[in-house]
Regions:
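Ligand-site clamp/hinge motif
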Residues: 244-290, 434, 443-445
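A structural "hinge/loop" feature
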Residues: 53, 72-88, 111-112, 138, ...
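Gly/Pro-rich hinge or "lid" segments in bacterial periplasmic/extracellular proteins
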Residues: 194-256, 266, 274, 375-384, ...
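Surface-exposed binding/hinge segments that line
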Residues: 161-205
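Aromatic- and charge-enriched surface segment that lines or borders ligand/interaction sites
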Residues: 2-11, 113-158, 179, 318-320
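N-terminal lobe/hinge region of extracytoplasmic solute-binding protein
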Residues: 69-119, 150, 218
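Detector for C-terminal structural segments
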Residues: 49, 331-364, 424-434, 457-586
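Append "and occasionally in soluble cytosolic enzymes with long acidic Gly/Pro-rich linkers
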Residues: 229, 235-243, 321-435, 525, ...
Length: 586
C-alpha cells in the first residue's frame, strides 16, 4: 500500500515544478486559472451539499413551546361536563380515554392495551395497559373507568354525554379489566370509549359541578396543567401546561403549551398579530382570508356539517310540491355561496351525508352544467308545473276545481319566508339564496334571529316555512336524530319534519349493524330515499380553519369532526427539529 502511494506521489508535480509552471503563465492566464479554480470549488461544494441533502431527513426534537389563543373562558375542564369550546380544548389535552381516534380516523387503544367485541356486538371487554398513571402519579385503575361512566350516566350530573351511554352497563372484571354490556349493537361504541377518564379519588364525595378539579384538572392525557392565571374577578386569562412524560402513547415532543383565552374574535386576532399567541382557530372565513393574504399559515379541513334549507310542509304547503324544491335546487348558486361567504373554506353538497364521513363512498351526483343552464332548467320546471310570472315579477299559479257542478278558481303565490340565525355566514347565505330565487320569480322574505331566540321561538315550536340551518353530524348514528320520524317534534332534531317509514327502518337497522360494508349499503339507500323525497336543499359543508405556527410540524386534521379534535395527535407535533442522515433516523 505504501509503494502505491509513493508511485502516485511521484506522478504529481513537486512544489518547485508548480511554482515554475505558474511563473511561466501570463497575467491573463493566471486570472483564467483562478476563475476555473473558483468554478471548480463552487461546483464541488454544490454537489457535496446536494448529496448531503439527498441523504438527510428532518426529524423532530423534544423541546420548544407553543401558545394557542381561544375565544371563551373554560369552566368545566372535565370530560363529563365539558360544554364550551374552551372546556373541550383543555379537556382533550389533559385527559385520555380507553381509546383514541387516530389521524387516519380509526380508533386505537389508548389507556387500553386491547379490547375484544363479542360476536353479537353486545359486549366490549377492555384490558388496561400496565403502568398507566394520572398526572399526580396515582395509577389508573378499572375503578376510575367505572366511576367516570357512572357519573356520565347519573341523571343528576346532567352530562351532555349521557344519551350516548343510555342502555349501557359497565362492570369490573378485575383490576385491569372492564366489560361494557349493550342492549343492542352500537357501531359508534368505540367513539364512546374515547371519553376522558377521571381520577375517582379526586372527584368522589363532592358534587361534580362544584369540585375544584373543574378548573385545576388532573388527568392522564398528553399534557398536565402546571399553572393558571386569573383576573381579580376570577376570569381565567391563561393556562400553562407541560408534557406528561408518562403519557401512554409517548412523551409529547413540544415541552410547554400555553392556552390563552379572549372574549371575542377581534381580541383573538389582535393577540395573534401582536405575537402573544402562535395559533388560533374558530375564525370567520372572511377574517381567515385576510390573515392568509398577509402571510399567515392556514390549515383547513372539511367538517361533518350539513347546511341546507329545511322545509316545513305543515306551515308552507307549497313545499309539498317536489317540482318547486327541484327548481330551487337548480337555481341556488351553491358555488357562489362557498366562494363569497366561505371564501372557499368549504365544499358544496347535494346530500344529507357529509362528504368526509369515514368509510362512506359518496355518490358523485355533481353536474358540469353552467349557472345559466341551471337557471333555465329551474324556470322550465316551474313553467311546466303551471307557474306563470305576473306583472309584479313573481310567480303565481291558478288552479280550477269543480264541486257540485260549480267551478272555482284559486290563485297561489310562490312566496315563503326563510328563517335563520344572525351569524354573518347565515345572513349572507340567505341573501344569496333570496337573490337566486327572485331571479326565477319566487318571492322570498328573510327573518334573522339571535341564535338562542331562533332555537326557542322558531325551531322548537317548528314555526318556519324554510329553515336555513346546520346539522352537526359527528358520526353516522347522528343521522337518526335528524331524519327519523320519531324526532319530528321538539326536542327532536328532525327540523324538516320528515316522515318515511322506509327511512325509519333503514336508520334503525343501521344503528345496530356492526358490519361496516352492510352499514354503508344501508346509508346509501337512506340517501337515495332523501334525494327522492327532497325534504331539504343541501348547500354546503364548511371547513375547520386553523391558523398555525410556521414552525409547527406533525399536525394532521384530515379527519377531525369537532374543533378539539385538532389536538388528537398533539403528542406527535413538534416545533424543534434537526437534520440527520437517513441511516441514523431509524
Amino acid at each position: 500500500m505504501e509503494n502505491f502511494f509513493n508511485r502516485i506521489k511521484r506522478l504529481l508535480p513537486s512544489k518547485s515544478e508548480m511554482r515554475t509552471a505558474l511563473s511561466s503563465f501570463s497575467t491573463k492566464e493566471r486570472r483564467v486559472l483562478v476563475l476555473l479554480f473558483c468554478v471548480l470549488f463552487v461546483t464541488t461544494l454544490t454537489i457535496v451539499q446536494n448529496i448531503n441533502k439527498s441523504f438527510m431527513v428532518t426529524v423532530p426534537l423534544r423541546g420548544g413551546s407553543l401558545n394557542e389563543g381561544i375565544v371563551g373562558t373554560p369552566r368545566f375542564i372535565n370530560p363529563v361536563l365539558a360544554l364550551s369550546d374552551a372546556d373541550k380544548d383543555l379537556t382533550s389535552l389533559v385527559y385520555s380515554g380507553l381509546t383514541r381516534k387516530y389521524q387516519s380516523g380509526q380508533f386505537i387503544p389508548d389507556l387500553a392495551e386491547s379490547y375484544t367485541v363479542s360476536k353479537d356486538g353486545l359486549s366490549y371487554t377492555f384490558v388496561l395497559k400496565d403502568k398507566i398513571y394520572f398526572h399526580d402519579g396515582t395509577p389508573v385503575t378499572a375503578d376510575d373507568i367505572i366511576f367516570t361512566i357512572n357519573e356520565i350516566k347519573d341523571p343528576l350530573t346532567k352530562s351532555p354525554r349521557k344519551s350516548n351511554w343510555d342502555g349501557i352497563t359497565v362492570q369490573k372484571i378485575d383490576e385491569k379489566t372492564i366489560e361494557f354490556n349493550l342492549k343492542q349493537p352500537y357501531e359508534s361504541f368505540l367513539e364512546n370509549a374515547t371519553v376522558g377518564i377521571l381520577p375517582a379519588s379526586i372527584w368522589k364525595g363532592t358534587p361534580i359541578e362544584l369540585n375544584d378539579a373543574n378548573t385545576n384538572p388532573i388527568g392522564s392525557g398528553p399534557y398536565k396543567v402546571t399553572g393558571v392565571s386569573k383576573q381579580s374577578s376570577g376570569i381565567i386569562d391563561y393556562y400553562t401546561l407541560k408534557e406528561f412524560n408518562k403519557f401512554v402513547l409517548g412523551t409529547p415532543y413540544i415541552k410547554n403549551l400555553t392556552l390563552k383565552f379572549y372574549p371575542n374574535e377581534n381580541d383573538l386576532i389582535s393577540a395573534l398579530k401582536n405575537g402573544n399567541v402562535d395559533q388560533v382557530s374558530g375564525l370567520t372565513p372572511e377574517n381567515a382570508e385576510k390573515l392568509k393574504n398577509i402571510g399567515y399559515n392556514i390549515q383547513s379541513s372539511v367538517l361533518p356539517r350539513v347546511f341546507g334549507l329545511f322545509f316545513n310542509q305543515n306551515q308552507a304547503q307549497i313545499f309539498t310540491d317536489k317540482k318547486i324544491i327541484e327548481a330551487m335546487n337548480q337555481a341556488i348558486d351553491k358555488d357562489r355561496i362557498v366562494n363569497e361567504v366561505l371564501k372557499n373554506y368549504g365544499v358544496t353538497i347535494n346530500d344529507p351525508i357529509p362528504p368526509n364521513m369515514l368509510a362512506y363512498q359518496k355518490l358523485n351526483n355533481d353536474t358540469n352544467t353552467s349557472r345559466e343552464e341551471n337557471v333555465k332548467k329551474a324556470i322550465a320546471i316551474l313553467t311546466k308545473d303551471g307557474w306563470v310570472k305576473g306583472e309584479d315579477g313573481y310567480l303565481h299559479k291558478t288552479t280550477t276545481t269543480k264541486k257540485n257542478k260549480k267551478t272555482t278558481k284559486s290563485t297561489s303565490d310562490l312566496a315563503f319566508v326563510i328563517s335563520t340565525g344572525n351569524a354573518p355566514e347565515l345572513s349572507k347565505t340567505a341573501n344569496i339564496i333570496k337573490e337566486n330565487l327572485t331571479e326565477i320569480g319566487m318571492k322570498v322574505e328573510i327573518q334573522t334571529f339571535e341564535i338562542g331566540n331562533l332555537n326557542q321561538s322558531v325551531i322548537r315550536p317548528r314555526k318556519y316555512d324554510a329553515l336555513l340551518f346546520g346539522q352537526i353530524i359527528n358520526h353516522e348514528s347522528d343521522l337518526f336524530a335528524f331524519w327519523h320520524s320519531s324526532q319530528r317534534l321538539d326536542p327532536g332534531l328532525n327540523v324538516a319534519m320528515y316522515t318515511n317509514a322506509k327511512v325509519d327502518k333503514i336508520l334503525e337497522d343501521a344503528l345496530v349493524t356492526v358490519d361496516e360494508k352492510n352499514r354503508v349499503k344501508k346509508y346509501a339507500s337512506f340517501e337515495d330515499e332523501i334525494n327522492r323525497d327532497m325534504p331539504a336543499v343541501f348547500l354546503y359543508s364548511p371547513s375547520f380553519i386553523y391558523i398555525v405556527s410556521k414552525s409547527l410540524d406533525g399536525l394532521n386534521i384530515d379527519h377531525i369532526t369537532t374543533p378539539e379534535d385538532r389536538f388528537l395527535n398533539i403528542y406527535e407535533w413538534s416545533v424543534e427539529k434537526d437534520g440527520i442522515w437517513k441511516i441514523f433516523s431509524k
